[in-house]
């Protein structure tokens, strides 16, 4: 390797290591909630039999939980392992919205564990762990009608 190129590259690598940057992805701050597989994107997708519903960055259907009563997240512990909540990122401007998403309906609620969860029309958002690929909504009507996909207007899809 040419010595003149090695020095600047070495300085760049050293600066990144000392500065905490990464060429591949940003490092979360120590207090940041780690990004989950759910991502920080809310978009509108089509699900067979249901039509247009909210989906996450992976295209997985987002659901509301009827006992949440539009404002309080009541799915914790085992429930949250089965129905992972869509956690809110730390910082402004971190959530991306696809076409058809009404940004005025997006908010957050503090969960029992103190972490913020994204909401839509005051409904805390969840994914279903058994929805393995985009376009699935196998959690629709689950638990005797307590879980429903959520529409772009913010209502349950029946």
How does the language model describe each region?
Residues 21-158:
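Compact beta-sheet-dominated domain cores in extracellular/mature segments
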Residues 1-11:
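Bacterial N-terminal signal peptides that target proteins for export
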Residues 10-20:
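Bacterial N-terminal signal peptides
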């Amino acid at each position: 390797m040419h010595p003149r190129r090695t020095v600047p590259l070495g300085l760049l690598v050293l600066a990144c290591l000392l500065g905490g940057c990464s060429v591949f992805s940003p490092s979360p701050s120590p207090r940041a909630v780690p990004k989950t597989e759910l991502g920080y994107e809310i978009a509108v997708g089509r699900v067979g039999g249901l039509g247009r519903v909210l989906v996450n960055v992976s295209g997985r259907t987002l659901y509301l939980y009827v006992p949440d009563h539009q404002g309080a997240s009541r799915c914790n512990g085992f429930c949250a392992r089965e129905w992972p909540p869509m956690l809110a990122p730390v910082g402004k401007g971190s959530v991306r919205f696809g076409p058809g998403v009404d940004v005025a309906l997006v908010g957050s609620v503090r969960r029992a564990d103190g972490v913020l969860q994204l909401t839509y029309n005051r409904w805390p958002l969840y994914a279903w762990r058994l929805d393995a690929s985009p376009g699935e909504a196998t959690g629709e009507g689950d638990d005797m009608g307590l879980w429903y996909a959520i529409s772009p207007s913010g209502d349950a899809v029946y």
